[in-house]
Amino acid sequence: MDALRPGSPYQPIIEELRNYPQKRFYNVSKLGGTKYDVLPYSIRVLFESSIRNCDGFLVKETDAMNILDWKTKQNDVEVPFCPARVVLQDFTGIPAMVDFAAMREAVRNAGGDPVKVNPACPTDLTVDHSLQIDFSKCAIQNAPNPGGGEAQKPTAKLSPLKGQPRKLPCRGQSSCKGPCSAGELSRASGQFSAQIENTPILCPFHLQPVPEPETVLKNQEMEFGRNRERLQFFKWSSKVFKNTSIIPPETGMAHQVNLEYLSRVVFDVEDFLYPDSVVGTDSHTTMVNGLGILGWGVGGIETEAVMLGMPVTLTLPEVVGCELTGTASPLATSIDIVLGITKHLRQAEVAGKFVEFFGSGVSQLSVADRTTIANMCPEYGAILSFFPVDNVTLKHLRHTGFDEAKLEVMEAYLKAVKLFRNGESSSREPEYSQVVQISLSSIIPHVSGPKRSQDRVAVNNMKSDFQTCLNEKAGVKGFQIAAEKQNDVVPVQYEGNQYELSHGCVVIAAVISCTNNCNPSVMLAAGLLAKKAVEAGLEVKPYIRTSLSPGSGMVTHYLSSSGVLPYLSKLGFEVVGYGCSTCVGNTAPLPEAIRNAIKQGDIIACGVLSGTKNFEGRLCDCVRANYLASPPLVVAYAIAGTVRIDFETEPLGTGFNGRSIYLRDIWPTRKELHTVEEECVISSMFKELKEKMEKGNKRWNSLEAPESPLFPWDLKSTYIRCPSFFDKLAKEPVSLQPIENAHVLLYLGDSVTTDHISPAGSIARSSAAAKYLTNKGLTPREFNSYGARRGNDAVMTRGTFANIKLLNKFIGKPAPKTIHFPSGQTLDVFEAAELYQKEGIPVIILAGKKYGLGSSRDWAAKGPFLLGVKAVLAESYEKVHKSQLIGIGIAPLQFLPGENPNTLGLTGREQFSILFPPELSPKMTLDIKTSTGKVFSVFALFENDVEITLYKNGGSLNFVARRFL
């Protein structure tokens, strides 16, 4: 969007920023007065956007005043919102950029200047999603080698060595199988422990480069080859369209880094300042609210509308204030706190609302904590969870490499418009729809087990709870061990040393990151605890099967850049590769002596892991008690060697000089954790990321793309085609034409989803899309999915209503078929629609309640339009989909209350005629006449003048295109 809308009625409140006279901004706090001062921070962002983008048509003065009157208007009015930018994924980016390329073509053909066609706001498109795997990563790469001996070495390419941390000695011969020389994979117990991500990592024992498996490199090459055409189109887009940046594949950015790298927090466009805000098709879009950036996920057609300069519309939401107080327990990890907060929010019924955090406890949460909470909105149903910018945010941005001068301007601006939150409790907090109070001190760390993940046990009750499990009858928790046998000890000889096993002994300890990727600080906490333990002289018994599975390159970066990997290794937590190896039970077998001792003494041995599943016997058939715990607690229980320990009163073990070491002595404080995270990890991570972004990658840099302002469409392409949305584009829209003698293409029931309308999965071999691709010379293996072919309107039109579960009442059973009434033939939906179009017969759709349920999907509106559908007549609609129909030029009509096809005696075999008056008005009624002589009234579901204008123009694409003529 433009920083300054020409002709805005609010230009008199534009001011210069104090101490920065060259910087200007809308001082919305002066306009709003005391009403503004009590608005939630998130609503203040909506208000500023409405003031800055007010043009009297798309955004009216009444919209701005409705937002200012949020307290009385919440839930009652619809308001427009013009986000500052858009984030797209490759799947949703293809159709959006294809539409822009087609619009340029149409504008040129209609006599306009195609170079003027550009996204109206900054648009970032990430091309970092693997679409297909050609070479298996071997799901059991960590399984035991039953044949024994040396496993065959795969050909591998070495990752570059980033640095040489201080070497620490190995635990002993049992856990070290020889030197990890260049070109050789590290082995433990005869298994490969190779990474499966393109991220440099060192062998944790010998600090040598770990190779990348050949399969990864092959997959990357195959993926690049398969997607070359689309990648060339993206590269062309980045060259010719203003406001467009493409994040190329293999950049290796996790969602958090990706979103933070793209985030501005405050926009500075030609010295005009305004808050950052975003909508995106990525499900992780809400994560940016943890940085004080208002944003949420929408469908592809909504993001495209924003790119076209249109606002998104939302019902002015309730805002739930979440007050955080108290101090977190020392043993509570970030994940404990995050899960504790999300649990409270689930119980608070915040679905469909904004959540905003305030209170003294907010400053205890790092930005990683905040973004994780914000990212978990789907867990508790909120639209977003907003953390206003504060000193913690600024400190984080400083460590990510934000320019200091920009930070100073940012802080001054946010304070000027009252969008900056002070750490201390303010005398005047915003007024919220409701307040949920959460005391951080009430969040107690738990473990789950011993058999089911839903059986949670407070860590301080663990010893007594395990004792209860021994006593209870065999069942969901109990083991029914006789009282006289509960203190049995079984001696065992292992590697020349004598050990004792008893009930509760830990024999498997696995630090797994599959549930911790969005907040790697808990993995860092495990590493810092390991460091302190090693420095204190603590060890892990060698018979305990320990392992470390980082889960992602981001977690590896946390562990390696902070220098804790060698300490984890010293305790036996050796990297076993990326992937949930221990989660799915692929751990190395326990030593035979240990297995025999457990079975001989009928010992209830324990596994402790930080995964998600702990079913009995999952890790090993002789390990009957399995607990899920946070990564640092996994390390702590491994050191203790038993779960029958009270961490408050009993030491983990004996350190140097015979000193008893308690958990509190080595547990990292939250301050320590945040300091290491911000100063060591975050700063180096963003430095590396920016270098990678500036350098690009070899394949992307060498990729050739056209230089012309118009895209040279390849008529042979099966991925990218110029769509026909603009075929009738002229400077002025044609007057509304009646829909005369329309046949019903489909007669559908209730709850028809967008997936019924436009499936995203694989292309069935018998489908119309498959026939088209076969005629283009493709084999079934090359069909790919509908999602991958969203840039080809011919495939997507043929895929419309191609879901095999579609229930058309004309057919009577689930099938993507319908009847072509003039001929009486039963055909594929596309074939019937094609015949109707050749005959010049318009078609409509009859449907029941909740038409268009499910995820927003652009082709669920575009597809029916290209099939020739002029109107949908339903009992009710999913709101977003109804707006999408208008946005593409299809009339959404609704039966009057109490009426439906059955009550009106409609069979769907009639022909329907719909007359439009010369002037449409919001929510007006229209008359429909059938070929049988029946006349009935329906609502035309146009909510406002904007929707009527879009419909008259044939949809938003044509409406915007006409602006360039």
UniProtKB/Swiss-Prot annotation:
GO terms for cellular component: cytosol. Gene3D superfamilies: 6.10.190.10, Aconitase, domain 3, Aconitase, domain 4. InterPro entries: AcnA_IRP_Swivel, Acnase/IPM_dHydase_lsu_aba_1/3, Acoase/IPM_deHydtase_lsu_aba, Aconitase/3IPM_dehydase_swvl, Aconitase/IRP2, Aconitase_4Fe-4S_BS, Aconitase_4Fe-4S_dom, AconitaseA/IPMdHydase_ssu_swvl. Binds 1 [4Fe-4S] cluster per subunit. [4Fe-4S]-binding affects RNA-binding activity, thereby inhibiting activity of the protein. It is found in: Cytoplasm. Its main location: cytoplasm. It comes from the Eukaryota. Residues 142-170 are annotated as: Disordered. One of its GO terms (molecular function) is metal ion binding. Coiled coil: none annotated. PANTHER family: ACONITASE/IRON-RESPONSIVE ELEMENT FAMILY MEMBER. Belongs to the aconitase/IPM isomerase family. RNA-binding protein that binds to iron-responsive elements (IRES), which are stem-loop structures found in the 5'-UTR of ferritin, and delta aminolevulinic acid synthase mRNAs, and in the 3'-UTR of transferrin receptor mRNA. Binding to the IRE element in ferritin results in the repression of its mRNA translation. Binding of the protein to the transferrin receptor mRNA inhibits the degradation of this otherwise rapidly degraded mRNA. This is Iron-responsive element-binding protein 2. It comes from Gallus gallus (Chicken).
